[in-house]
């Protein structure tokens, strides 16, 4: 049963929310425009504010539901982590889109809200604070990911717990998925979210 839940979590994460919104609302393939990501930020820029909001909420739900599904079966922390990272992996490398998905920010957030709501909302707080000051989504995501392992350590107090280890893995993964954004940030060329009037 554990293997089934882990596999189901991957397929849950693989649901291409942003891609579907782009196709149905604007008949566009988000993989071919903007950042090429199917995440909420690319939806915001190319489809609209409200579609991006719903994509974000659904993508958060994918990570949260995967962990909650595992918790309904067992309370083993390692199993919860495996289900969560399976959903995150599905979001980044969805089978339906030949492995080209999002950057794991929203789905990772949902995963950590389910594992530790304090850590999840602390990371969300960092994201929102940086976004309000900088108007740069990528910078906000990178810094939220950077502080994630610290928040988890402060919450559980150890570094050999599956929760801390997965926070480290997801932090690195999210930052690596933003490599091109980091290069643009260094050059001062990263786009800002200045208008949300779509």
Curated annotation (Swiss-Prot):
<comment type="similarity">
    <text>Belongs to the PlsY family.</text>
</comment>
<keyword id="KW-0472">Membrane</keyword>
<feature type="transmembrane region" description="Helical">
    <location>
        <begin position="1"/>
        <end position="21"/>
    </location>
</feature>
<dbReference type="GO" id="GO:0008654">
    <property type="term" value="P:phospholipid biosynthetic process"/>
</dbReference>
<keyword id="KW-1133">Transmembrane helix</keyword>
<keyword id="KW-0997">Cell inner membrane</keyword>
<keyword id="KW-0808">Transferase</keyword>
<keyword id="KW-1003">Cell membrane</keyword>
<comment type="function">
    <text>Catalyzes the transfer of an acyl group from acyl-phosphate (acyl-PO(4)) to glycerol-3-phosphate (G3P) to form lysophosphatidic acid (LPA). This enzyme utilizes acyl-phosphate as fatty acyl donor, but not acyl-CoA or acyl-ACP.</text>
</comment>
<keyword id="KW-0594">Phospholipid biosynthesis</keyword>
<keyword id="KW-0444">Lipid biosynthesis</keyword>
<comment type="subunit">
    <text>Probably interacts with PlsX.</text>
</comment>
<comment type="pathway">
    <text>Lipid metabolism; phospholipid metabolism.</text>
</comment>
<feature type="transmembrane region" description="Helical">
    <location>
        <begin position="77"/>
        <end position="97"/>
    </location>
</feature>
<feature type="transmembrane region" description="Helical">
    <location>
        <begin position="157"/>
        <end position="177"/>
    </location>
</feature>
<protein>
    <recommendedName>
        <fullName>Glycerol-3-phosphate acyltransferase</fullName>
        <ecNumber>2.3.1.275</ecNumber>
    </recommendedName>
</protein>
<keyword id="KW-1208">Phospholipid metabolism</keyword>
<keyword id="KW-0812">Transmembrane</keyword>
<dbReference type="Pfam" id="PF02660">
    <property type="entry name" value="G3P_acyltransf"/>
</dbReference>
<feature type="transmembrane region" description="Helical">
    <location>
        <begin position="111"/>
        <end position="131"/>
    </location>
</feature>
<dbReference type="GO" id="GO:0043772">
    <property type="term" value="F:acyl-phosphate glycerol-3-phosphate acyltransferase activity"/>
</dbReference>
<dbReference type="GO" id="GO:0005886">
    <property type="term" value="C:plasma membrane"/>
</dbReference>
<keyword id="KW-0443">Lipid metabolism</keyword>
<dbReference type="InterPro" id="IPR003811">
    <property type="entry name" value="G3P_acylTferase_PlsY"/>
</dbReference>
<feature type="transmembrane region" description="Helical">
    <location>
        <begin position="136"/>
        <end position="156"/>
    </location>
</feature>
């Amino acid at each position: 049963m554990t293997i089934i839940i882990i596999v189901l979590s991957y397929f849950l994460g693989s649901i291409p929310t942003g891609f579907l919104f782009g196709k149905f609302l604007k008949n566009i393939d988000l993989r071919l425009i903007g950042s090429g990501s199917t995440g909420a930020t690319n939806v915001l820029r190319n489809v609209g504010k409200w579609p991006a909001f719903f994509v974000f909420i659904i993508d958060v739900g994918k990570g949260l539901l995967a962990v909650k599904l595992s918790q309904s079966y067992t309370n083993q922390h390692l199993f919860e982590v495996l289900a969560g990272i399976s959903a995150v992996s599905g979001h980044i490398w969805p089978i339906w889109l030949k492995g080209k998905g999002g950057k794991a920010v929203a789905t990772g957030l949902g995963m950590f809200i389910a594992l530790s709501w304090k850590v999840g909302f602390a990371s969300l707080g960092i994201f929102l604070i940086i976004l309000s000051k900088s108007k740069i989504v990528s910078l906000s995501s990178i810094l939220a990911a950077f502080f994630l392992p610290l928040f988890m350590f402060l919450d559980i107090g150890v570094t050999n717990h599956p929760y801390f280890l997965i926070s480290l893995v997801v932090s690195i993964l999210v930052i690596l998925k933003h490599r091109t954004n980091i290069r643009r940030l260094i050059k001062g060329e990263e786009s800002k979210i200045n208008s949300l009037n779509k």
